[in-house]
Amino acid sequence: MIKILGIESSCDDTAVSIITENREILSNIIISQNTEHAVFGGVVPEIAARSHLSHLDKALKNVLKESNTKLTDISTIAATSGPGLIGGVIVGSMFARSLSSALKKPFIAINHLEGHALTARLTDNIPYPYLLLLASGGHCQFVAVLGLGKYKILGSTIDDAVGEAFDKVAKMLNLAFPGGPEIEKRAKLGDPHKYKFPKPIINSGNCNMSFSGLKTAVRTLIINLKEINDTVINDIAASFQFTIGEILSSKVQDAIRAYEQITNNFDKKNIVIAGGVAANKYLQKILSSCAKTYGYRLIYPPIHLCTDNAAMIAYAGLERYNNKLFTPLNFCPKARWSLEDISN
């Protein structure tokens, strides 16, 4: 049986996973660093890298035990090799390449964004091509996923990523880190129409997005408010989340038009939302409704596979393993690595 070992360390989650050729996840271990970074209100790259170094060996032992797998049973080792916080990326990549060398097993360098992009093929086995909205703390872009290693970016944020906007607004409201889940929780208790926030470049006619102005508008409101109590916090969270939904819904329409200009895929019309923001149930509901209007089905992974994980890295490794797309051990990890620059 083919077994793929996946390693993820691009940000603040140390993750190791083993999957089979049948897309079965045998084990998926994630060691979170949230408590280590919470006091700083965000991820500290140096702390993240050092934590990966101390957690990886433990995570590997746990995943082998949980999956009842020996290291010698592993067919290939896939590891995030960019983009991301370069210290953590180097730690994970070096760990994987050391294992590869010692075990004499192939190594596969995985683009972290490709891991997110292919998650829906792991969970739902959808065919190529499909439209992807990649929404996380570090990225926000619409991508035409045409095949393995064949990606066309249709539009992206021109400033902040949507996940970053969630985290920054949460910090303004003195909510816990990470901020996305806290905003969603507070929004359920608030009035989404209490405050009207701007929707930057919503009528631009292209697939690009902007969230910096929205973030600034929230900050300005908070500064000018005389009192900030729980009711106000809930209303701001709800109004902010509502505005994000409006922006993304509008841009999904633009992305569908752009996607249909470059594909002939009119039988199985799928839109995938991936990345940490895909875990937001309000956005899932809003975007599902928008997709349905245009005859598309919105697919989003289970919550534990929306955020950073190694199962998605292992699956991307499986697709590349099946196509014999291996990576030399002298591969240089990358802090920046566009989906369009992936080479097969």
UniProtKB/Swiss-Prot annotation:
Cofactor(s) required, per the database record: Fe(2+)
EC assignment: 2.3.1.234
**Chief subcellular site?**
cytoplasm
- Keywords, A to Z? Acyltransferase, Cytoplasm, Iron, Metal-binding, Transferase, tRNA processing
BP GO terms, sorted:
tRNA threonylcarbamoyladenosine modification
Function, in words: Required for the formation of a threonylcarbamoyl group on adenosine at position 37 (t(6)A37) in tRNAs that read codons beginning with adenine. Is involved in the transfer of the threonylcarbamoyl moiety of threonylcarbamoyl-AMP (TC-AMP) to the N6 group of A37, together with TsaE and TsaB. TsaD likely plays a direct catalytic role in this reaction.
Q: What is this protein called?
A: tRNA N6-adenosine threonylcarbamoyltransferase
Q: In which organism is this protein found?
A: Rickettsia peacockii (strain Rustic)
Q: Which gene encodes it?
A: tsaD
